[in-house]
Amino acid sequence: MNLTKQFFKYVSQNIFGLLGTSCYILADTYFISQAAGTDGVTLLNLCLPIYNFIFAIGSMIGLGAATRYAILRAQGEERAAQRYFSNAVFCACLLAVPFVLVGIFCPGTLLRLMGGDAGIVALGIPYARIFLLFTPFFMCNYIVSAFVRNDGAPSLAMVATLSGSLFNVVFDYIFMFPMGLGLAGAALATAVSPILSIAICSRHFFQKDNTVQFVRQLPSATLLGQSCQLGISGFVGEMSSGVTTTVFNFLLLGLAGNVAVAAYGVVANFALVATAIFNGVAQGAQPLVSRCYGQSDRAGARKLLILGSCTALALAAMLYAVVFGMTDTLVGWFNSENSAQMARFAHNGMRLYFVGYFFAGFNIVAAGYLSATNRPLEASVTSICRGVAAIVVCSLVMSALFGMNGVWAAFPASELLTALLTLFLLLRKKKQTV
């Protein structure tokens, strides 16, 4: 199979898998909006940064370790490559412990820190407690999926992710309504879904063509650090949504209160779907780019970067056409109380915010390419610019100048600035070895 066909095979399957992951958060939002109205949507939006942080750690360890594994295997360093999988699982479980402890002892305190008032905190404690207790499974799901994909089984990784997501959607409804568990039921369905995904992915480890081995060893900070170097773009890619959500939540609370945060909850949930599409392009291309890099195939790696960038631009155009043409319909799905104010806020937000994906798609693909070709410093600069520095500065400045419309427009502005920086970094290295 030629490189272009391999690219579209890996990317399409990874997009479908990650879309499934983001869609179960959409399902949560829809069912919670039906059960608890705008307060429920506000609660979920306050919890999204916590989800993002958990997913970001799993993504950083999983993608980074799997990238190291793919590069070393392409270079013939089989023994060194095998140490990364077991170390990633051990370290993820250790890093999950603080989240589990917070879930047991002080979920309410965490919700207050995220900006929840007394009513939101009381509503959200059961929800937060349950999903925090299952943090190890969320993190390990990223790791197992990344290694299965890098070991030549992207189809199985896609099936596993979609199966977990379908389970979540179906059991969201069953747990919340027929069984009457309310928000705790939504959290339980979300928490169990990665366990199913891990179980399906684990079939690969018993196949004849499996090359991933679980090595008995003590957790290694050195291996973890080497993994995180190449996984930092994945971390910041996930965290960018969390940072954006946290900053926007506090700005919108100050501008218009809980209704504005609920409106942003609608925007943020659709943004998760959009981000998943572009993460799918970057993560789908990563095994192929890493293999080209390990084999010193500079032309192949650059071809994949061009394919990824063009694919991201085409997807951004299709995405914005859907958002622009169906804005009121999309907002209406999550406005069970028919709040005219929330609908107005969310309508403006969707149309301004999603312009940013014309630039964000390129930034995500480029950061993934830099990580996959063992350029962690440049990947980190690009990712931190888009995920933290640019979005914080733009949102603070533009909200002060233009109010709520400034908050929505901060995302496209920050992604444009990051795209210019990323293009400079790529062109600066054009004459150097991949």
Where does each model-flagged region fall?
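Helix-loop interface residues and adjacent transmembrane-helix termini in multi-pass membrane transporters
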Residues: 26, 35-38, 72-75, 150-151, ...
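Hydrophobic transmembrane alpha-helices of multi-pass small-molecule transporters
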Residues: 53-56, 168-172, 198-202, 272-276, ...
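Short runs within selected transmembrane alpha-helices of multi-pass transporters and secretion channels
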Residues: 62, 130-149, 157-165, 186-199, ...
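Hydrophobic/aromatic residues in alpha-helical transmembrane segments
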Residues: 12, 28, 65, 106-107, ...
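Transmembrane helix-bundle signature of multi-pass secondary active exporters and lipid flippases
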Residues: 14-63, 67, 131-138, 225-291, ...
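Short alpha-helical transmembrane segments in multi-pass integral membrane proteins
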Residues: 1-14, 69-134, 178-232, 289-356, ...
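Small-residue-rich hydrophobic transmembrane alpha-helices
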Residues: 41-101, 138-157, 263-327, 360-382
